[in-house]
């Protein structure tokens, strides 16, 4: 009996399949699914609670209510399995068939499926070549459509109103046929010959010239070809039979009090059945046409609401005015089937609880409350109890566990040993948000967490909760242990830095112990070893920070590499160190020298220390070392007894004078403003600058006072040493707080921002130590509130960005070791404003070289192409001063579906070459998304203090060398003999003796050059200066000013300052000008020479025209004499807003969405020479003449800044009109490498501003996914249509096929898609549907009869298979190999049998490839 029951318990083996296909069901198909027709709208009898026969819950159609029991109760029990009761007609079987048996409704009149009617573009409209409006009028019985014009002059598919129709009937009689409603549309669809239509469309496409037509035809052709390929008939878009969902999936549940709770679908079905039955009756009664028509329209509307309520017209509502939830609503959106149930399942064997700190744990352990463990490990305990014979049955074992007998606790200990559990803290923003630990049983109800993993989980102990999951199967336990154990995940996958870095009190303790003090107790003593130092310290003979000499034993790598020689040998040397440092030397792992500890350990130093340990000593030693560091840190912090006291916040005495001086300067600016020397805007900018500087100065004075203290040394001399002030130590060590926060405590709070981001010009001069007055407190609240509001909004934004990133990259997995490409990108150090922002070593670390790395001095090859550059390699490269290395990149990887390991390089989370099967796409998405969330949550900590980088107003050299100017640099010499820059994109370079570029600086228009080309300079020399607050307009020629179109009230306004009474002329915006004629004129200056002739541009006919931009303040008068290099007008730069990641996060999203910026700059389309053509109204004409002499014209709005001058040679892709770059232009004109460099640099800029490190390769992976589609330019002999966008791998596969068959392959161009668009245009419809716009995706997929090959991770999660990544990739590979082998064996046997029986073999060509769908 038991065996029999076990048989029933066994789950059926899941079906093995390789793909899922979606299509349209034909009416016959729907009938074949059905188990009977639902004829009545009744559900269940409210008295007997039994389902009504032929109703929506009918047992005859859908199956029995109770297992193995018919409705009337005649047949009960298993023995009647499969019998159909003759009384009630119910089959005796399991009740769960009510979850899978469908019914159907025979519709009295056909009905259009709303998805194919209303999704944009309307599929019905496409196929019929009619407008949506027309089809709707026909379907909803407002108009007739001509089906068959016969001999009449009418056209097929012509629409006519009822009146027209009757007129035409009178005129032509029954020569023609016209219909209304879905029948008419169905006839039209039936009449379409798809093959014929496709042929005509293809030929028309070739012959037509108009862009609009090509677009229209291509769209229609795509839909028709889809029907042709998938074998779906267009008339199936019109329903004749409606399937009915199994009743258990739309349940009706009796509540107490005789009421019922029901699924909305039942209501919707009821309406359909009611209307359908009424319509049948009306047709039988031969009711008047108008009544029937109305009923048909109502049926159409009822079916529409069932399929997608609210898509057309008003949504159907239930009793409580709430719109009913239709079938479409069930699957779409966050609460729909895809995202709620398929991608976000709840799991068994899990629990959650609050976390508390567990400082006594080892890194791989976590404390699990006993009661929780007992519940989670129940099945294992039951099993153990049975095996040990304590309990005979599971029931008895249950009882034992419930009573919590002593034996149960012993067994729990045993079961739990070496059985890892997974801990997860929401939000899981990156892979380290779930890690495995070995549980240690503890009393209490809170989970204990190791302090060092908090950084990875972003956890703290202020009430955070974590979830525990138990891996059940042996394989799961093994994966948890080898891949997810906390001690195996010590690096951040985003940047390869250690994630187990101590923080807060640990750092404080280590820092305190490694500081040195002058004239501490016992200074100058010498000890024979660490144990002696310890004894002296315990006996209070020496202090922790005293300088002493100690003999220290280090374990160093053995030079002797022979057999049996130890790896490490001791080396003893005498070090001048401090007591604390020598005590810490005890925990150094072998292979690290004492010098790494012989300095004050701040947080950054400790991070570097752990990093060094990992690279030199390996994982195991590092983990042990980190644990011991933590223990020491806690112990030392306790011993140190550091605390905070109000008196620690020392306010600098010179604060008063600094603030006083600033106030004087501000007054001076007010006075200048009053007398009209500066504008209100300039005054504001200057005042803000003064207060920023003051805030800095006070802060500096405060830090100077705080950071050192006077002390007497051993010889009795006064000297200063680094301070032991508690607050200073906390900030300096990196334990808590920052200089900015200390400045607010003891310096001055400084400038605050308004909620809109603009800076309030009166700063808070007080600090928290002195206290704020009411006004100051009020201003402070602005910043604090903005911070809190921002946080909430930006967390959501950042989460959405992460979701889009994951969606676009989820199918990118490393699938092979090497794709063998010879392409790559050249990496250089990233230099900005003369400073090396990112060194070359950081950019190439962990990448594979694609060209040999050559020593520049000796020309010998250091590293061959194909070498993975590790730490030692990059250090060597840096030492030799190599400034460019070509490396492989994910962008140029030639693997079709996925990536290869060589192009990706090092797996940053593991520190070695990436494994095949690593889901690098998801890791990249998480690495970029995770800090976004972090940052967005982090803004308000500064309390809104306006931290604005002071604007640069000069450039100075950082290194010695020779000044060189780029070809684009142009300057003129003015009357004072100063060199004034007049080029917009000039750069100054500093080169070393070998002529290698050391730094590069942009020099803005209007700057004064202090050094010229070829000058030898020392570091620190100023190269150029300029006014940062205004942009000048400068003349390159001398002469007499002659104004044109400078008319007051038309193009310029006289601004009279209310305060000063002085007037200036300001150019006004064309949009604000009154009359139409004045909108096109542009105020400008012409110059006249001594004879009153217009000055001409040398070597051309054009006279000099200098235009003024909107907002320019004109500083010259009409008729004034000007010299070369003089300023004609100034444009004030806008008031500065504070920058934090608020600007940053949308910027990142904008880059990844590949949006074209508003006023994008214009790039040169060709290489050639520039000249200016004739200006049209409001636009200037720029002409580029290429090398063949062809001219390319650009029309440019006059207010734009043109960066080129007459006769300049520009290269293709060079910026010619100022403005933000458009990534699509960069891709088109400069190629993939330039595009990737642009996106990577721009994204990195945003993150760098926040001090977040992300490796470039993560961004490159995303860019690869944005480039995964191409646009066909010429289709050759392929199946594509010109202008169609297809998956790159598809394209390449098809071209390979063409080449193999000696046909013409297609040509294509790269296109850049934003991440949302790329996610939606993926080949997998399951993945796209679960992302966004579910209805549209499914509609399209159904018509095209799409097949999803389940390549990505998301599709596989949804269908419930192992994902094709990591161990799953190997599993699927093995499965496929086995299938292939089986198939070959099968074919072989078949062939042998065929040979034996002498039947002719089937030719190979006709054998259909076998796929499991």
Curated annotation (Swiss-Prot):
It catalyses: RNA(n) + a ribonucleoside 5'-triphosphate = RNA(n+1) + diphosphate. Binds 1 Mg(2+) ion per subunit. GO terms for biological process: DNA-templated transcription. Residues 1393-1413 are annotated as: Disordered. Zn(2+) 2 binds at residues 819, 893, 900, 903. Its EC number is 2.7.7.6. DNA-dependent RNA polymerase catalyzes the transcription of DNA into RNA using the four ribonucleoside triphosphates as substrates. This is DNA-directed RNA polymerase subunit beta'. The gene is rpoC.
